[in-house]
């Protein structure tokens, strides 16, 4: 594990403990401590994804937060700026690696505890930490972030 991924794991834990959900905590850690340029309006986009989209236990909110960070680094503002064929392979690769590493991309599979219980909060914090480190290592490997 790199020093950067360890630092990001610590920072996502701080964000989570301060009240951010999994998706927000990932985005906050990268915007605040890794210099990823995500403004407040864009940050708000992460709020509804916690708990697998508003506690629906669907797609993992932390995975969505990771995808938001990656998209901020390699995405586009207009269709003319960059073709999607330059963006999708990177986000797809991260998705596939995530699924292989964690066994699923679904909140209900990753977090089998009742929401807002002690077990849920403890395990979601631990999982969000692992996911944040996983993203940090991916970004370093791809040369998408310099530390």
PLM regions and their residue ranges:
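Acidic-glycine-rich active-site phosphate/pyrophosphate-binding loop
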Residues: 1-3, 30-48, 101-109
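Polybasic, low-complexity association/targeting segments
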Residues: 1-18
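Phosphate-handling active-site elements
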Residues: 33-44, 72-90
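Transmembrane alpha-helix interface/packing and boundary motifs in multi-pass membrane proteins
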Residues: 48-57
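Conserved phosphate/anionic-ligand binding catalytic regions in large, soluble enzymes, centered on
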Residues: 56-65
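DPxDG-like acidic metal-binding loop motif
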Residues: 65-73
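C-terminal binding/interaction regions
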Residues: 86-147
């Amino acid at each position: 594990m790199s020093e950067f991924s360890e630092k990001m794991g610590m920072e996502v834990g701080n964000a989570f403990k301060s009240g951010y959900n999994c998706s927000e905590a990932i985005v906050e850690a990268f915007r605040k401590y890794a210099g990823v340029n995500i403004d407040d309006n864009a940050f708000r986009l992460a709020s509804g994804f916690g708990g697998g989209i508003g506690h629906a236990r669907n797609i993992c909110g932390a995975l969505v937060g990771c995808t938001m960070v990656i998209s901020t680094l390699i995405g586009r503002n207009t269709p003319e700026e960059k073709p999607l064929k330059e963006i999708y392979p990177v986000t797809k690769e991260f998705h596939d690696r995530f699924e292989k590493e964690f066994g699923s991309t679904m909140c209900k599979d990753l977090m089998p505890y009742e929401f807002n219980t002690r077990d849920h909060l403890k395990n979601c914090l631990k999982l969000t930490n692992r996911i944040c480190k996983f993203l940090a290592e991916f970004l370093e490997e791809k040369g998408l972030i310099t530390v």
